Amino acid sequence: MENIEYLNEIQAVAGKLIHSYGVPVMITLFLRWLASIVAVFLMILDQTKWKYSNNIMASLLAPYLFSSLPIVIFQVLRNGVGKWIALLTVILRLFLPNHFHESLEIPGATILLIVVTPSDIGAIFRDDLRYTGGDVCLLTSFYLINKHTKACGGIKNSFTQKDKVTYSICLWILFVYPILSSFAALFYL
């Protein structure tokens, strides 16, 4: 019986959010979270043994994450936690290069990018996805999809070969997010 009460409360909260912000904003917010999770997943997947022979250039995911990371996570990384992680990254990289694993290069660079970027430049790339930030996300995701599709031998092969399906789905999610968020931006102009 308590489970039903929790579901009713969640439904009421979701209804209030949709009523106050609107459906396009909620869809954009959901897609922003999903795209960020997928970008982190691809970054992790690229450093594991499960990856296939096509290197997806995970370094391009750093600017994508910078411009599409949800504001809550971005502010946490930009303030206290991110500064400590960036400091540890720099110390390990400079003074203990043998102990700094190669798989930590791109995540460390992403955290450094988030922490070190000046507020004015960060606002240009983050606040409005219709302009610069959206362009970065769209161009990055388009390049990654194009490279992945060519390496697979076409769109059909990228979805039929079992070792490439995960990459294909994740890259298409990264591509759909900036397009749908720009369409959603038309509704609240």
From Swiss-Prot:
Task: Give the record's membrane topology.
Answer: Multi-pass membrane protein
Give the signal sequence positions. none
Q: Which domain of life is it from?
A: Eukaryota
**Which intervals lie on the Extracellular side per UniProt?**
1-24, 77-79, 126-168
Classification via Pfam families? WCOR413 (PF05562)
Gene Ontology CC entries for this record: plasma membrane
Question: Keywords for this entry?
Answer: Cell membrane, Membrane, Transmembrane, Transmembrane helix
**Residue ranges crossing the lipid bilayer per the database entry:** 25-45, 56-76, 80-100, 105-125, 169-189
Entry-linked PANTHER family: COLD-REGULATED 413 PLASMA MEMBRANE PROTEIN 1-RELATED, COLD-REGULATED 413 PLASMA MEMBRANE PROTEIN 2
Q: What is this protein called?
A: Cold-regulated 413 plasma membrane protein 3
